[in-house]
């Protein structure tokens, strides 16, 4: 069941399975998609478990600087 639950979130994330962290990271991608309306933003933002340039750009664009480090750490935790 763990694997199914995990894959409902983001199959590329093989680190800590933390629903809240994953939800927060996904929200950055969703908000980014809503702002830019580029079809590939959502997919690219989630690729490699959020450890990518698109996610970083979305985060810098959408989030106040004091939250950047927190999100970077979250990416490391849920990633490999």
From Swiss-Prot:
Disulphide connectivity of cysteines: 13-49, 29-45, 32-58
Tree of life domain: Eukaryota
Compartment annotation: Secreted
PROSITE patterns attached to this UniProt entry: CHH_MIH_GIH
GO molecular function (one): neuropeptide hormone activity
Matching Pfam families: Crust_neurohorm
Keyword set, alphabetical order: Amidation, Carbohydrate metabolism, Cleavage on pair of basic residues, Disulfide bond, Glucose metabolism, Hormone, Neuropeptide, Secreted
Function: Hormone found in the sinus gland of isopods and decapods which controls the blood sugar level. Has a secretagogue action over the amylase released from the midgut gland. May act as a stress hormone and may be involved in the control of molting and reproduction.
Family as reported in the entry's similarity comment: Belongs to the arthropod CHH/MIH/GIH/VIH hormone family.
Protein name: Crustacean hyperglycemic hormones
Organism expressing this protein natively: Penaeus vannamei
């Amino acid at each position: 069941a763990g694997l199914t639950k995990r894959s409902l979130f983001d199959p590329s994330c093989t680190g800590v399975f933390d629903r809240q962290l994953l939800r927060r990271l996904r929200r950055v991608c969703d908000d980014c998609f809503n702002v830019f309306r580029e079809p590939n933003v959502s997919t690219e933002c989630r690729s490699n478990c959020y450890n990518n340039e698109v996610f970083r750009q979305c985060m810098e664009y959408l989030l106040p600087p004091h939250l950047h480090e927190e999100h970077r750490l979250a990416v490391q935790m849920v990633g490999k």
